[in-house]
């Protein structure tokens, strides 16, 4: 009733980044296990921090960091020139702040991938700002995305790093889908890229699971059989594997042509309806 919640973090964890999700937004948060920290939501979107890492948390939720726009309304060539300045600007802003040196060291690496996400946002944001029904960037844009997909195992702890690879590879796969109109071709393009370019086993397993689990959620299990051996090879986490194959088995029961499970109920007029009476 008071709206106050308490979360206890094990002292054995190292300080690091977290995200606090609300009904309409989320806040970045730097956790320091073993120390007291507070976050208070005021009116509207305004929030207040107290306790350990207060200055860091104010920085992470600052307008400068979260309202970055390299010029999404610009044409491709102009946008790429403007975007090239973003990593340096983010770094300079960080260097100008009186924040702990150990935090700055890790934050510099994370900021690079924050900027990379802004690059991936360009096609969708450009289309929305110019009210275009569809928009596909040119070869130069896709070449830039490919150039930036360089592995750095020391950055795997950062969500922004993992998501940049996931979203970047999906963007390249979406281009293939645009050519053929088939979602399965997009998935194959993503998996081919992972197999041919990703050397880090931990990152490869993460990306294969993201691509195949995402495909099943949106398009079902049809056509997935050929990729199952690859999943077993690349994904090492047994709990992750179990969750994936549980989902896969559930979706195979929804394939076209399969008999519907037994289920019946009374409608508002008292007539019994069976699920097997319906098609679709």
Predicted regions and their residues:
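Solenoid-like repeat scaffolds
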Residues: 96-99, 194-199, 232-237
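Alpha-helical repeat scaffolds
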Residues: 127-146, 183-194, 222-232, 261-262
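A non-transmembrane, solvent-exposed segment enriched in polar/low-complexity residues
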Residues: 1-106, 110, 114-122, 126-134
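N-proximal helix/coil linker or "cap" segments that precede and/or mark the start of modular domains
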Residues: 205-208, 212-279
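Extended amphipathic alpha-helical segments with heptad-repeat/coiled-coil character used for oligomerization
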Residues: 108-168
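Serine-centered coil/turn micro-motif
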Residues: 52-54, 139, 158, 238
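Long, charge-rich alpha-helical interaction segments
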Residues: 151-218, 223-226, 243
